[in-house]
Amino acid sequence: MPELKDFHVDENKVWFNGGYWPEGVPKQLYNVENVSIDPMWEGFLKTADLYDIWDKDVCVFVLGEYIERVKLRTLFDLAKKFGTFLYDKLGIRKGDVVAIELPNSINFVVAYMGCQYIGAIAQGINPTYRPMELLHSLTMTNAKVLVMMDALYIAGPNSVLPKTKVHTVISTNLLDFITATGDIFQALRNNIPSFQDKVPDEADQYKVYRMKKIIEETEPKEIKVEIDPWIDPAVYLMTGGTTGLPKVAMLSHANLISNLYMMRPWTMLEHGMITIGSIPFFHSYGLTCVMSAALNLGLVMLLFPRPPTDDVLSETITKLEAPEGIIYVAVEMLFKRLVDYVESIGEEEYKKKYDFHKKMKYASQGAGPLHDYVRIPFEKIFCPIRVGYGLTETSPTCSINPFWGPTKTGKLGLPLPGVDWAIFPSDDFEAGPICDGTPESNNFGIEHTGEICVTGPHVMLGYLGEQKEQEDNLKMWNGKRWLLTGDIGFMDEHGFIELRDRKKSLIKVSGHSVFPKEVEELMGHHEMIDEVAVAGLPDKMTGEAVKAWVTLKKGFKADQDIDSETLKKWCQDNMAKWKSPKYIEFVRKMPVSLTGKVQHRALKEKDLDKIEKGKEIKG
């Protein structure tokens, strides 16, 4: 069995000695206070005892103006009942997969904890998946149980489930764990109707149960399961799927636990702090930084079934007591939306009405880049945003900018305790690193750009059923197992890495490398531009051409205040010719995923279809 000391990082690396390593943060993960690699359920128990939080509210669930508070002891009781039902009634055993197709809710937390109680593998599924996407996810993991909202069941998974290994569907409703009664409950019911009476007791090829009834009728049992945290998966999560269909990342108990303890001293996480759960739990960012942070480190998770409007978010925060402070775990889209709301009513008026700005200790950005045109106004109104870098395959966090003391904006930060990173040739990993972070390598700076590779105990077990993908993305070097991230960047003399772009997003214009992120950042400085997305399109003359999709700030109109030719000229005046967009299309809004990432592929595919049909590209 591995030990944390097996992941020792050479303390000669420049990030330890360049003047930016945060004071008081151990250089090695094995030196972090109270670090212990246990099965998830054991970790939950240890945390509850260590901080004596059994009778503390650790889950705060918001439905409109209603707030439901749940004590940790209650969560354990509910989870043990759910796990007992899975084990006794359904025969679910260690290694079996339970798919959870739910929004952030008490329901999700109970289902997830119940899986960890019996050693089942929890698979998070996006509730907005269409039938074919659901079929693909369930087929890849061979899930045996599907937990889903009653409204989604009514929408019709019947065409999909008979083609899978699912033998049981557990239907639930957002009000299943709400304790309100009388008029308050009825008001909630008016907004969140129940479809349980329309859910059948069984279908032709699977049984159907109701989660609320399961909890009411099941007596919890003590179930002991032998789990090796280093080799047994705790969760299956779908990766972003930048090309083709998404893959399934297998994350072990040790992957998830080690990542939490990497972040803890760096971000100064303390039990009792509130972490805002707007990021979905089927995504590794929300799973680790919100739910697992609460259950394994003693934080309080503030849950919304969908990202709230900014007035609701601000009003909710104002109602809550937060003596330990609040962490806003979010993505650029949510930060921008909050800034836009403050500016719409005026900063002075906002701060009279709400106290969010006083309670927010810091904000953490992940799941994509953070542009200065969002960061600067947010930090002026609220607090510093610290950017984290990671992937689903790394549970997810690899690095974060230092929270206190000197730092560098626009960088990916420094690797967390226990994480090592290096820059390798993007087309020849076996040649060894271009820059490994030792002073001797001395290959620092933009001229030594390559693929960012990381190693540490947080790196996934592998891709489920994808042997070639696994071999292409997980490779051994110098006795360590490295993940090839697919991201292109370079390291500076202090160990900070600057991300240039995704390897697959790189645009080649007449032999020049164009990084979409750089063009987006430059165009974002235009006074009329609100958001911009950049991608490459095939071009007969130059190989590829740059296209930008642009939304304008409120009060500006395309073709009246500015047109594409005027904006192209501005770009040519402010960046190299080969970087300047050949096409600029104004759009009303950007397509975004539930995690707030702009879906460049969705924009690009419309034009690829036009090219294939011989039609003219807009812009």
PLM features per residue range, with description:
Residues 1-70, 74-89, 94, 163, ...:
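N-lobe entry segment of adenylate-forming
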Residues 69-73, 226, 234-258:
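Conserved AMP-binding A3 loop
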Residues 129, 136, 146-148, 456, ...:
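AMP-binding/adenylate-forming catalytic core of the ANL superfamily
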Residues 172, 575-598, 616-619:
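AMP-binding/adenylate-forming catalytic domain of the ANL superfamily
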Residues 189-238, 245, 268-274:
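Conserved pre-ATP/AMP-binding loop-to-beta segment of ANL
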Residues 257-274, 282-327, 336-337, 341-350:
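Conserved AMP-binding/adenylation subdomain of ANL enzymes
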Residues 415-418, 428-476, 514:
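Conserved ATP/PPi-binding loop(s) of AMP-dependent carboxylate-activating enzymes
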